């Protein structure tokens, strides 16, 4: 198994410096990760830094709270793609889901899907804040809205991916969608366990350590 191709090599910290982003890009080129995941302000820089490779540029929308309006999320998506983004990781409107406003949750996802054109859209459900029933419902809504992936976590809330959540999400969406486990993978064994549970992507800042068989310091 080429585990490197499962990894979205991630740096989303608000205080990330250019030299840290450059290091992320250098590692992505060396290890051939699936993508780098960076904040929108770094997309154009990342695109230039990865020219000549097959590493994709992934960015985030409505991040990390998911509480911006659908129009704002759609604008963010369009601008990110204009700047070179290949993949969009959007955050759902968690408050709307908790309030039972499923129509808003679905239309919010659909707004990003439509704005993304042919680019990949991953829907962050922030599983640590949801009941199992809510996880099932929102995965179904993401599927209905035409998204490509469901993703466990932002890495900025109360917890990251768990095997139980990845298993439930995979069972819910079947084989038609990708499942991204974000946070929670701190070792090669962790990453492998997520893949075996049904993950087709792993979001982590510790991709290099994982591939080297080392134990990572952080959770994301």
Curated annotation (Swiss-Prot):
Keywords: Cytoplasm, Lyase, Schiff base. It is an enzyme of class 4 (lyase). InterPro entries: Aldolase_TIM, DeoC, DeoC/FbaB/LacD_aldolase, DeoC_typeI. Transmembrane segments: none annotated. It catalyses: 2-deoxy-D-ribose 5-phosphate = D-glyceraldehyde 3-phosphate + acetaldehyde. SUPFAM superfamilies: Aldolase. The keyword Lyase applies. CDD domains: DeoC. Pathway: Carbohydrate degradation; 2-deoxy-D-ribose 1-phosphate degradation; D-glyceraldehyde 3-phosphate and acetaldehyde from 2-deoxy-alpha-D-ribose 1-phosphate: step 2/2. It holds the Pfam family DeoC. GO terms for cellular component: cytoplasm. It is found in: Cytoplasm. Gene3D superfamilies: Aldolase class I. The active site is at residues 89, 151, 180. Its EC number is 4.1.2.4. Coiled coil: none annotated. The keyword Ribosomal protein does not apply. GO terms for biological process: 2-deoxyribose 1-phosphate catabolic process; carbohydrate catabolic process; deoxyribonucleotide catabolic process. One of its GO terms (molecular function) is deoxyribose-phosphate aldolase activity. Catalyzes a reversible aldol reaction between acetaldehyde and D-glyceraldehyde 3-phosphate to generate 2-deoxy-D-ribose 5-phosphate. Belongs to the DeoC/FbaB aldolase family. DeoC type 1 subfamily. This is Deoxyribose-phosphate aldolase. It comes from Streptococcus pneumoniae (strain CGSP14). The gene is deoC.
């Amino acid at each position: 198994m080429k585990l490197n191709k499962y990894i979205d090599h991630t740096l989303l910290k608000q205080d990330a410096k250019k030299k840290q982003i450059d290091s992320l890009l250098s590692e992505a080129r060396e290890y051939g990760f699936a993508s780098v995941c960076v904040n929108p302000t770094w997309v154009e820089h990342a695109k230039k830094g990865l020219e000549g490779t097959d590493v994709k540029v992934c960015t985030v929308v409505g991040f990390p709270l998911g509480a911006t309006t659908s129009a704002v999320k759609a604008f963010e998506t369009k601008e990110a793609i204009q700047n070179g983004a290949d993949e969009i990781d959007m955050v759902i409107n968690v408050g709307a889901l908790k309030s039972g406003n499923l129509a808003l949750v679905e239309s919010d996802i659909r707004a990003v899907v439509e704005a993304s054109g042919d680019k990949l859209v991953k829907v962050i459900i922030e599983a640590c804040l949801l009941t199992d029933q809510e996880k099932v419902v929102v995965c179904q809504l993401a599927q209905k809205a035409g998204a490509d992936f469901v993703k466990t976590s932002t890495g900025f809330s109360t917890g990251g991916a768990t095997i139980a959540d990845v298993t439930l999400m995979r069972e819910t969406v079947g084989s038609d969608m990708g499942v991204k486990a974000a946070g929670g993978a701190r070792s090669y064994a962790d990453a492998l366990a997520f893949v075996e549970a049904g993950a087709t992507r792993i979001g982590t800042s510790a991709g290099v350590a994982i591939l080297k068989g080392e134990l990572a310091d952080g959770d994301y």
